[in-house]
C-alpha cells in the first residue's frame, strides 16, 4: 500500500534532512547557504582573543564556565535537588489503571474507521482528495471488511435506485465495533454482543422493508409558503426540528437550573416550550488548580498532590513546578458525577468523582474549597456530556403535567415544570427555570396555556385512537415502521421531541433510517426515568440526552465514527438495563433491541417479519462463529513461535495459553527500538522499517491507545513513535509519542509510571548532542520556562529522524494562529454554533412581536456560571495613598543605569519621589530627566577592566579583586548607606551588595531589580555560569547556590564589620539574609526569558524598561545618506558593534570585520571600540582604511538605529540585546564576559539570531548572510519584536511594586526584630544589650531552615544567637 502524498513527502524530507552532514552548530539552516560561505582555513581561529598573557598561557580568556564551574559540569547531571524521579507515593493503590485495550492485546481491537454517510444527499468526502487517495482508502476498507466476515452489504432500496452502486460500494459497508473499546474520546461502549445483535436486527429490519425517507425540515420548508411565518419561527423550526413553523407566543430571558446555571432564552410557541442556551467553551484554560489529597485505590491513606483542572482532564502532580510530568489523571470524558461526601460532623471536606471505571476519593483543605472543586468538576462533566456548543431543550405543551413555584433565592423567581415522557411509561421529568425578571408573568402565562391545551389534546388523542383502530393493516404497519426509523412520531402526545444530545453529525444523519447509531437513543429517556426515580443534584450531567447539536452545519463530509455512535448509545441508556440483555433472547427475538418504549404491536410486527429476514441473512450462530474466528486470528499467527517456546519453558507456554502473540511482539519490538510513522488514519506507513503489512490493516487502534494513555482529545492524531531513554536521575526507558500538537513520553520499565505531556507551543528548540553514555546519541529539548529534557537513542538514525520530525512540527505550530478555542478540527463546529446563535439573535431582534429580552451569554463567554456561587473578590487598587520616597541603588556601566531612569520616570508620573544612587559620572544624565541623585563611590571602569582582562570570577579575577577591591568595597558600602537615607522604599541591583542590609537597618521594604537571572531555578543556569554544552536542571540550580556562596564569602567579613560599625546590626549569614525570599523585578521580556515554572509568586519578569531617547535625536547627514544609498542599491544593512573590549590584535579583528562584510555582500554601520588595552584612546580609530560599504559612527540611540537596519551584530549585553530584539531584527551575538553568554544562548534558542563562539571570516560572513536572508529567522525576529513592543515593562513593574509592597513590609519587620541592637537607627523594644532570649523567638520565626526537624532548628538557632551575642559583646569592649 502506498502512503499518502503528504506522508511520502514528509518521509523524503526526513531522509534528506537526516543525511545532511552535521554542521558546527546545532542550528539548522533554513535556506541553502552559497558555497562561498563554507568554512575556510580560519574557521577555528578567534580574532577576539585577548592579548597573550592576560588570563592564561594560551591567550584565551578563562570565563567562569571554564574554571570554577568545570567541576560542577562533571557531576551536574548526577545531582538532584528536587526529586526529579517520579515514584509512586503510595505503593499499593496509586497505580493508574492501564487502558482496557491493553488487557485484550491479541483480540480484534483495531480502531473502526468512520462510518460513511448513507444518505445520498450528503457527500462522503471532506475536501476533494486526490483519486489516488480515494482508491487507496477504498482498497484498504474492502480488505479490512473481507477479513472480518461479520459485515452485511445493505441492499439498495427503491428510493436509492438513482444512486450509482459502484461509486458507493465502500460506503455501503459498515464495520461491527471492536470486541473491546479503547479508551479514546468516544463515549463508553455497550456490551459487545448486545450491540452486535442490535445492529444486526436493525440491518435486517431496514433491508426487509422499503426505504422511507425521514421528514427533512429543510425540504418541508421549501414545500410550504414562508410568508406567513416570521423569521424567528422559521429559525426555531430548523433548530428544534419542528414539522412546521410554529408561531412564537412569548419569550423570556431565563436560566435552566440543575447543578449548573445555564443562561438562555425560553420560547413558548403554539405547540412547544423551548429553551436555548449558547455555551462557547475553551479547552486551553485551566479552570481551577490547587492542592488536594487523593486516596489510593487500595490504600486508605490520603496523599497530597497539586491538581489542575484543564479541558476535560483532572491531572495531579507531585510538584507544581513540574507540570509536564503528571503523576496521574482522571479523564472526565468518562465522568458520571461529582458530589460531596457527607460526614457526621457536618463539615464536608471530602468529595468523590465517579467515572465509568472507578470512583476517586479526594479531600480538600476546607469545606468551601471542596464545594468549589465539586462545582468546577460538575461544570466539566456537564460539558463532556453536552458535545456541542449549545444546549437545546424542547417538549410539547401537551406533555406538561403541571407547574409549581419553587423559590430558591431572593434575587430570582423559580418554578418547576413537570413533563411526561411518553404515554406508555408515564415517566416524568422535572425542569427548573429561574427568572430574574418577569418570573411571575411567565408562570401565569404558561400555566394558563397548559390548562387551555390539555382539553384539546385529550379530545385529539381520543380521535387519533379511533382512527388508528379503523385503519387497514398495511397502513398500520407503515405507521409502525415510521415510528421506528424516524426522529419523530406523528402523534404529539407520544412525540419523542428533539431531545437528543448534541452530536457531530448533521440533521440528515440524525433523521436517517440507515444510521443505526441514533436509534438506540430513542429509549433512553424512558429507561432513565424508570431507573432514576428521584432527581439528583447532578442528574443534568447524566441526562445528557436532552441536548442537541447545532442544526446548521458547515461540515459536508463529517461522518459518524462507529465507536462514537456506540458510545453515544451507551451513555444515553441505563448501563444496568443494557447489562441485563440476555444473549439467547436477543438472538432469538429481533425485537429485543428496538427499545423499551415500543408497544406489543411493534413486537408482533417485528416477529412477523422474522421469516422474511431469515432468508436474507446468515444465522446468528454463524456470525458468532465468525466472531470467534476473528478473535483467535492473532493466536494463529503465533502458532509456530509458541510451539518453539512451549518446548523450552512451561511458564511461557502457560502465558501463551492466555495471552496473544501481540504481547511477545510488543516486548521484543520495545527492546529492539526503532521508530514508526503513522498516516492519516493512524496506521504505520509501509516505508518504515520493521512494519508488517498485516499490522497496518488492523492498526487503527494505535491512535486510540495513545490518546487513552495521556487522556488527549480525539483530534490529537498520532504521527510518530520512538523508543528512547529519558534522562532524569537515571536513564528511564520508554516510548516517545509525537502528535500534531504534543510531545509525549511514557515509561515502559515495570515499577515506573512516568508520563510526560509537553505541548509544542512550549518547546523553543531541539538540538542534537552527544549521548551521556558511550554508543548512545543524545537529543535535547529546550522548553520555555523549564529545564531542558535529555533523550538518548541507541541509533543515530532514530535520533535524527525524531529531531527532523520535531522541527517540522515546531515550524507548523509556531506559525499557526492560536485562537484559544478547541482543536483545529472542531473549529468548524464551533463556527456553526456561533452562526446559529447569531442568526437566532438576529431573528429574535427583527421579530415583529417586539421581543425585548436582554441578551445573555455572548460569543466571547467561556464559562458556565456556577449556581449561587460566592462572588469573586473585586480588584483592589494596591497603590499607596501617599507618595513614596523611592531610592534605586545600582552600580556598573551605562547599561545598568539606563533601566532605572526609565523606571523612575514612570514613578514620577505616578506621583512618587524617586532617586537614583549610583556613580557620580551619571549625575548629569539622571538629573536631565528630573530625577534626584545620590553619589556612590567606586570606579565602574576599574571593575570592567578586571572582568574583561581576567574573565568573570576566575581565579585570577578573585586574586586581583581581593588585592585591589578591599578599599573599593568599603567606600561603596559607606556611600550607599548615606545615599539611601530618608527612603520609604529601596530597589537595588544585587551587584551593589549593600541594599539588603540598608533596608534591614532602616526597616523599609526592599525590592531587587536586575537585567539577568539571579534567582535559583532549574530552567536556566546562572548568567555568569553558562556552560558550553547543556547540563540540565541540576547543574542550572547548583550554579546559583555556588555563586551565592562564593560571592558572599568574598565580602562577608567587610559587610558584617560595616553592619556592626555603621548600621548597628548584628552580623548575619547567607541563610539569615534569605535572599530567595526577597521580591524581585526582572527588567527583561518574558517573551525572551520565559518565567520558570519553579519561580515563587514574588518573582516578576516585567518586561524591558526602555528609555526612549531616539525620538529627539537627529542623525548626521552622512549616516542618513549612507542608509538611503544602501536601500536604493537593494543591499542589506547591518550594524556591528562589540563595545569596549580588549583583543590581542585589534587590526586583525578590524580586517576580519571588513572581509566578512564584503564577503556577505551587505552594507555595515560600524561602532568600533576594541583595542589591545582598556581605555586606549585609539580604540575608536581604525587601523586600516574602511571600504565604502562600511560607515563608522561614534554613537547613536539604539531605538532609532536598530529600526533602520536589517540585522545587528553585537556583544550580547542585556540592554543592547533587548533593543535589537525590540526592533524585530535578527541578532548576531559574540559574547565576551558576564551575562552576554546567557543572552546569546537565548537568542539562538528562540531562533531569532546566532550566537558565535569564535569570530573569523568564515563564521562571521556566514552568520551575516543567514541573518539577512533566512526567512525563518527574519519572521521569528519580527514576531518577537511585535510581542516586545506590545509590552509595557515599566507599568508592569510599578503594579508589581504595589502588589508585593505589603509582603516586603512583612519581611522588613521580621528581619529588623531579629537583628536590631540598641545601636540600630530604629531600635526595637525587644532589643537588649546582651542579646537575650527575647530575640530567639523572632529568629526562629523568620529564618529559613529547609527540611530540618524542630529539635535541630531550635538547637541550631540558639547556638547561632549565642555566638552572635558573644561577638557583639567582644566588639563593644574592644
UniProtKB/Swiss-Prot annotation:
Residues 1-60, 83-190, 206-227, 458-538, 1314-1338 are annotated as: Disordered. One of its GO terms (biological process) is lipid glycosylation. One of its GO terms (molecular function) is sterol 3-beta-glucosyltransferase activity. Residues 1-14, 29-41, 125-138, 461-473, 490-499 have a biased composition (Basic and acidic residues). PANTHER family: STEROL 3-BETA-GLUCOSYLTRANSFERASE (PTHR48050:SF25). Sterol glycosyltransferase responsible for the glycosylation of ergosterol to form ergosterol-glucoside. This is Sterol 3-beta-glucosyltransferase. It comes from Penicillium rubens (strain ATCC 28089 / DSM 1075 / NRRL 1951 / Wisconsin 54-1255).
Amino acid at each position: 500500500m502506498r502512503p499518502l502524498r503528504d506522508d511520502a513527502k514528509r518521509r523524503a524530507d526526513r531522509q534528506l534532512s537526516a543525511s545532511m552532514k552535521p554542521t558546527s552548530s546545532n542550528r539548522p539552516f533554513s535556506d541553502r547557504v552559497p558555497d562561498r560561505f563554507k568554512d575556510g582555513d580560519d574557521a577555528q581561529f578567534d580574532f577576539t582573543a585577548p592579548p597573550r598573557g592576560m588570563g592564561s598561557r594560551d591567550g584565551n580568556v578563562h570565563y567562569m564556565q571554564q574554571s570554577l564551574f568545570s567541576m560542577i559540569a562533571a557531576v551536574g547531571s548526577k545531582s538532584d535537588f528536587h526529586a526529579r524521579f517520579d515514584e509512586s507515593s503510595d505503593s499499593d493503590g496509586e497505580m493508574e489503571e492501564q487502558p482496557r485495550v491493553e488487557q485484550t492485546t491479541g483480540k480484534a481491537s483495531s480502531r473502526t474507521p468512520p462510518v460513511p454517510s448513507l444518505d445520498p444527499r450528503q457527500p462522503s468526502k471532506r475536501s476533494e482528495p486526490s483519486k489516488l487517495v480515494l482508491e487507496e482508502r477504498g482498497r484498504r476498507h474492502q480488505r479490512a471488511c473481507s477479513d472480518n466476515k461479520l459485515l452485511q452489504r445493505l441492499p439498495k432500496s427503491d428510493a436509492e435506485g438513482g444512486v450509482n452502486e459502484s461509486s458507493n460500494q465502500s460506503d455501503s459497508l459498515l464495520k461491527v465495533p471492536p470486541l473491546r473499546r479503547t479508551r479514546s474520546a468516544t463515549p463508553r461502549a455497550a456490551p459487545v454482543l448486545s450491540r452486535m445483535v442490535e445492529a444486526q436486527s436493525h440491518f435486517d429490519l431496514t433491508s426487509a422493508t422499503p426505504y422511507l425517507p425521514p421528514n427533512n425540515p429543510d425540504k418541508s420548508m421549501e414545500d410550504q409558503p414562508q410568508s406567513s411565518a416570521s423569521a424567528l419561527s422559521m429559525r426555531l423550526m430548523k433548530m428544534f426540528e419542528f414539522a412546521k413553523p410554529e408561531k412564537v407566543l412569548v419569550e423570556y430571558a431565563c436560566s435552566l437550573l440543575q447543578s449548573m446555571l445555564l443562561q438562555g432564552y425560553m420560547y413558548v410557541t403554539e405547540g412547544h416550550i423551548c429553551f436555548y442556551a449558547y455555551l462557547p467553551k475553551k479547552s486551553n484554560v485551566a479552570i481551577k488548580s490547587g492542592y488536594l489529597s487523593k486516596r489510593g485505590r487500595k490504600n486508605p491513606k490520603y496523599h497530597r498532590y497539586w491538581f489542575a483542572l484543564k479541558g476535560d482532564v483532572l491531572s495531579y502532580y507531585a510538584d507544581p513546578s513540574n507540570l509536564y510530568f503528571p503523576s496521574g489523571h482522571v479523564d472526565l470524558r468518562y465522568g458520571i458525577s461529582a458530589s460531596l461526601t457527607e460526614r457526621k460532623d457536618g463539615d464536608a471536606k471530602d468529595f468523590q468523582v465517579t467515572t465509568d471505571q472507578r470512583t476517586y476519593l479526594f479531600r480538600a483543605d476546607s469545606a468551601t474549597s471542596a464545594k468549589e472543586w465539586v462545582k468546577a468538576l460538575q461544570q466539566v462533566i456537564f460539558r463532556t456530556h453536552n458535545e456541542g456548543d449549545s444546549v437545546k431543550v424542547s417538549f410539547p405543551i401537551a406533555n406538561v403535567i403541571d407547574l409549581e413555584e419553587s423559590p430558591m433565592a431572593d434575587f430570582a423567581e423559580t418554578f418547576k415544570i413537570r413533563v411526561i415522557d411518553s404515554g406508555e411509561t408515564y415517566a416524568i421529568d422535572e425542569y427548573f427555570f429561574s427568572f430574574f425578571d418577569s418570573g411571575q408573568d411567565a408562570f401565569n402565562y404558561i400555566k394558563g396555556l397548559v390548562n387551555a391545551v390539555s382539553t384539546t389534546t385529550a379530545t385529539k388523542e381520543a380521535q387519533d385512537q379511533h382512527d388508528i383502530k379503523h385503519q387497514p393493516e398495511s397502513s398500520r404497519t407503515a405507521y409502525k415502521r415510521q415510528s421506528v426509523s424516524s426522529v419523530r412520531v406523528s402523534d404529539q402526545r407520544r412525540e419523542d421531541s428533539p431531545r437528543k444530545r448534541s452530536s457531530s453529525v448533521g440533521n440528515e444523519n440524525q433523521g436517517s433510517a440507515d444510521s443505526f447509531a441514533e436509534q438506540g437513543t430513542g429509549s433512553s429517556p424512558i429507561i432513565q426515568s424508570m431507573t432514576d426515580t428521584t432527581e439528583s443534584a447532578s442528574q443534568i450531567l447524566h441526562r445528557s440526552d436532552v441536548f442537541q447539536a447545532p442544526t446548521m452545519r458547515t461540515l459536508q463530509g463529517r461522518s459518524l465514527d462507529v465507536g462514537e455512535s456506540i458510545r453515544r448509545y451507551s451513555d444515553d441508556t441505563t448501563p444496568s438495563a443494557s447489562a441485563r440483555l440476555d444473549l439467547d433472547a436477543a438472538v432469538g427475538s429481533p425485537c429485543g433491541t428496538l427499545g423499551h418504549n415500543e408497544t406489543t404491536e411493534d413486537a408482533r410486527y417485528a416477529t412477523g417479519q422474522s421469516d422474511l429476514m431469515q432468508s436474507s441473512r446468515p444465522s446468528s450462530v454463524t456470525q458468532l462463529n465468525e466472531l470467534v474466528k476473528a478473535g483467535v486470528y492473532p493466536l494463529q499467527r503465533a502458532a509456530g513461535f509458541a510451539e518453539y517456546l512451549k518446548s523450552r519453558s512451561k511458564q511461557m507456554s502457560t502465558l501463551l495459553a492466555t495471552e496473544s502473540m501481540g504481547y511477545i511482539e510488543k516486548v521484543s519490538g520495545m527492546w529492539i527500538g526503532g521508530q514508526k510513522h503513522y498516516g492519516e488514519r493512524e496506521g504505520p506507513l509501509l516505508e518504515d522499517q520493521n512494519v508488517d503489512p498485516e499490522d497496518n490493516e488492523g492498526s487503527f487502534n494505535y491512535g486510540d491507545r495513545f490518546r487513552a494513555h495521556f487522556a488527549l482529545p480525539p483530534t490529537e492524531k498520532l504521527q510518530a513513535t520512538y523508543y528512547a531513554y529519558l534522562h532524569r536521575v537515571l536513564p528511564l526507558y520508554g516510548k516517545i509519542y509525537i502528535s500534531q500538537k504534543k510531545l509525549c513520553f511514557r515509561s515502559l520499565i515495570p515499577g515506573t509510571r512516568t508520563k510526560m505531556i509537553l505541548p509544542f507551543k512550549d518547546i523553543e528548540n531541539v538540538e542534537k548532542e552527544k549521548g551521556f553514555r558511550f554508543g548512545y546519541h543524545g537529543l535535547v529539548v529546550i522548553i520555555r520556562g523549564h529545564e531542558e529534557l535529555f533523550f538518548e537513542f541507541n541509533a543515530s538514525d532514530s535520533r535524527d529522524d525524531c529531531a527532523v520530525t520535531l522541527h517540522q512540527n515546531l515550524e507548523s505550530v509556531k506559525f499557526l494562529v492560536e485562537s484559544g478555542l478547541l482543536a483545529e478540527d472542531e473549529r468548524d463546529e464551533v463556527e456553526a454554533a456561533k452562526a446559529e446563535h447569531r442568526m437566532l439573535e438576529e431573528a429574535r431582534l427583527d421579530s415583529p412581536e417586539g421581543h425585548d429580552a436582554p441578551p445573555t451569554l455572548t460569543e466571547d463567554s467561556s464559562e458556565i456560571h456556577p449556581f449561587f456561587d460566592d462572588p469573586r473578590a473585586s480588584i483592589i487598587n494596591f497603590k499607596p495613598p501617599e507618595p513614596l520616597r523611592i531610592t534605586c541603588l545600582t552600580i556598573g556601566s551605562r547599561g545598568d543605569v539606563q533601566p532605572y531612569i526609565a523606571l523612575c520616570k514612570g514613578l514620577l508620573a505616578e506621583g512618587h519621589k524617586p532617586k537614583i544612587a549610583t556613580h557620580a559620572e551619571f549625575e548629569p544624565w539622571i538629573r536631565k530627566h528630573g530625577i534626584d541623585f545620590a553619589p556612590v563611590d567606586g570606579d565602574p571602569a576599574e571593575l570592567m577592566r578586571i572582568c574583561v582582562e581576567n574573565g568573570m570570577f576566575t581565579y585570577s579575577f578573585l586574586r586581583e579583586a581581593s588585592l585591589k577591591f578591599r578599599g573599593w568595597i568599603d567606600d561603596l558600602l559607606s556611600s550607599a548607606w548615606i545615599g539611601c537615607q530618608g527612603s520609604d522604599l529601596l530597589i537595588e541591583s544585587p551587584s551593589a551588595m549593600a541594599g539588603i542590609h540598608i533596608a534591614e537597618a532602616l526597616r523599609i521594604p526592599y525590592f531587587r531589580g536586575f537585567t539577568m537571572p539571579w534567582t535559583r531555578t532549574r530552567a536556566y543556569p546562572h548568567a555568569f555560569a553558562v556552560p558550553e554544552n547543556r547540563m540540565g536542571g541540576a547543574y542550572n540550580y547548583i550554579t546559583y547556590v555556588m555563586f551565592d556562596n562564593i560571592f558572599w564569602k568574598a565580602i562577608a567579613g567587610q559587610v558584617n564589620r560595616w553592619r556592626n560599625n555603621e548600621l548597628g546590626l548584628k552580623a548575619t549569614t547567607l541563610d539569615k539574609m534569605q535572599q530567595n525570599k526577597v521580591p524581585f523585578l526582572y527588567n527583561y521580556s518574558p517573551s525572551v526569558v520565559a518565567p520558570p515554572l519553579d519561580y515563587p509568586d514574588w518573582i516578576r519578569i516585567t518586561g524591558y524598561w526602555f528609555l526612549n531617547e531616539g525620538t529627539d535625536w537627529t542623525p548626521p547627514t552622512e549616516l542618513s545618506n549612507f542608509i538611503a544609498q544602501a536601500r536604493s542599491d537593494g543591499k542589506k544593512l547591518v550594524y556591528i558593534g562589540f563595545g569596549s573590549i580588549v583583543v590581542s590584535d585589534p587590526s586583525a579583528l578590524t580586517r576580519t570585520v571588513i572581509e566578512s562584510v564584503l564577503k556577505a555582500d551587505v552594507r555595515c554601520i560600524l561602532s568600533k571600540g576594541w583595542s589591545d588595552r582598556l581605555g586606549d584612546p585609539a580604540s575608536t580609530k581604525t587601523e586600516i582604511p574602511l571600504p565604502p560599504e562600511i560607515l563608522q559612527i561614534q554613537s547613536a540611540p539604539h531605538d532609532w538605529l536598530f529600526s533602520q537596519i536589517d540585522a545587528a551584530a553585537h556583544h550580547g549585553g542585556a540592554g543592547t540585546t533587548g533593543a535589537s530584539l525590540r526592533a524585530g531584527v535578527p541578532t548576531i551575538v559574540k559574547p565576551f564576559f558576564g551575562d552576554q553568554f546567557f543572552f546569546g544562548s537565548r537568542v539562538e534558542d528562540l531562533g531569532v539570531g546566532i550566537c558565535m563562539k569564535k569570530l573569523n571570516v568564515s563564521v562571521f560572513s556566514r552568520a551575516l548572510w543567514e541573518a539577512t536572508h533566512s526567512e525563518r529567522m527574519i519572521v521569528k525576529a519580527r514576531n518577537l519584536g511585535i510581542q516586545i513592543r506590545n509590552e509595557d515593562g515599566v507599568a508592569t513593574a510599578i503594579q508589581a511594586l504595589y502588589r508585593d509592597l505589603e509582603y516586603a513590609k512583612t519581611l522588613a519587620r521580621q528581619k529588623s526584630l531579629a537583628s536590631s541592637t540598641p545601636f540600630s537607627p530604629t531600635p526595637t523594644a525587644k532589643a537588649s544589650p546582651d542579646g537575650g532570649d527575647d530575640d530567639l523567638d523572632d529568629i526562629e520565626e523568620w529564618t529559613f531552615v529547609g527540611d530540618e526537624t524542630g529539635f535541630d532548628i531550635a538547637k541550631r538557632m540558639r547556638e547561632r544567637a549565642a555566638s552572635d551575642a558573644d561577638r557583639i559583646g567582644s566588639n563593644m569592649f574592644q
